[in-house]
Amino acid sequence: MQQRQSILWGAVATLMWAGLAHAGEASPVDPLRPVVDASIQPLLKEHRIPGMAVAVLKDGKAHYFNYGVANRESGAGVSEQTLFEIGSVSKTLTATLGAYAVVKGAMQLDDKASRHAPWLKGSAFDSITMGELATYSAGGLPLQFPEEVDSSEKMRAYYRQWAPVYSPGSHRQYSNPSIGLFGHLAASSLKQPFAPLMEQTLLPGLGMHHTYVNVPKQAMASYAYGYSKEDKPIRVNPGMLADEAYGIKTSSADLLRFVKANIGGVDDKALQQAISLTHQGHYSVGGMTQGLGWESYAYPVTEQTLLAGNSAKVILEANPTAAPRESGSQVLFNKTGSTNGFGAYVAFVPARGIGIVMLANRNYPNEARIKAAHAILAQLAG
């Protein structure tokens, strides 16, 4: 009996030792981690970013790098499933939805906007196309609605009385009311409200099952808090057409799926055609060519050119448009996005099969995002 107990305890000890030895083994380090850490760690420190999710695509494989916390109060860490507000990166999904409406025959980009909204008949939008709304070239619609436009009735009245400052198509004026109206009317052309159409048709078609316009109760635990300049926890306050212009909440894993769809395609033929349509250039401003949602550059692209295309001058001022540049076979697509508490950046190069998603729960300068992403992509391109 004593011998049997000794054998039993010996076996248990052996198993325990094996378990401890296994637990002590270091998990394999992603070979891309030093590359990503070198750019991201200084960023977190300099801009006091509480948490960041970085997702990288290389050779068809996803790599995830997570830093800090999603919620300072609970201490919940960031993961590739953490939901972040992506601000204007939402415009790329809105543009894809609009392109899907085109592919389905519900509308055309050269349709006059008032064709899809009887309440716009007799206004300036009898002469402004859906494509001009989608590409911020309607003639000078502002970055934001005036503060007093806080209801659907006031929004309609605002559009009806608005008059272009420039000839439609002649100037780019980056604008939430412009692409917001495009998304709203595109959904109307498909006979559905925008949010259900996005959540029930487009996002599932892209494999983005953890992405929302309105975060449901069961996903709220994954929703990060953003942090203001004063370090107060905040989330987006929706305004008019916020869903269409800056309303998406998603994870780095889901947003990288969208990048992968833009690089390698999707099975749904109509959706694939829609994605391709968003990549087509409509005009150029400097080195940047404006597509539907996406902004593109001939690749390789210098850091300076990327910074210029995402500068305050391009975002806040009206810029004359020129014929779209010939980009050749290699193109980098990108988009920045922010809300008061979050900062996002997405960039990818289809010909190289590389892409990056950077989601942070602080709104920090575009310049810092672009410098970090440019450095990482340069290493990925090898």
Swiss-Prot record:
Zinc-finger keyword on record: no
Signal peptide (UniProt feature, chain positions): 1-23
Reaction equation(s) it catalyzes: a beta-lactam + H2O = a substituted beta-amino acid
This protein's GO CC annotations: outer membrane-bounded periplasmic space
Induction: May confer resistance to poorer substrates by high level expression.
Binding residues annotated for a beta-lactam, in chain numbering: 88, 144, 174, 176, 363
Record-level GO BP terms: antibiotic catabolic process; response to antibiotic
Ways its activity is controlled: Inhibited by the beta-lactamase-blocking agent sulbactam.
InterPro entries per the UniProt record, alphabetical: Bact_CellWall_Synth/Modif (IPR050491), Beta-lactam-related (IPR001466), Beta-lactam/transpept-like (IPR012338), Beta-lactam_class-C_AS (IPR001586)
Protein family: Belongs to the class-C beta-lactamase family.
Miscellaneous remark of the record: Described as a cephamycinase, but cephamycin substrates such as cefoxitin are chemically very similar to cephalosporins, and sometimes classified as a type of cephalosporin. Cefoxitin is a poor substrate, hydrolyzed only weakly in vitro. Nevertheless, CMY-1 may confer resistance to poorer substrates by high level expression. The class C beta-lactamase family has a specific amino-acid numbering system known as SANC, for structural alignment-based numbering of class C beta-lactamases, or else the simpler name structural position. A multiple sequence alignment was used to derive a consensus sequence and then the consensus was numbered taking into account insertions and deletions. This allows use of identical numbers, e.g. for active site residues, despite differences in protein length.
Protein's UniProt name: Beta-lactamase CMY-1
Organism field: Klebsiella pneumoniae
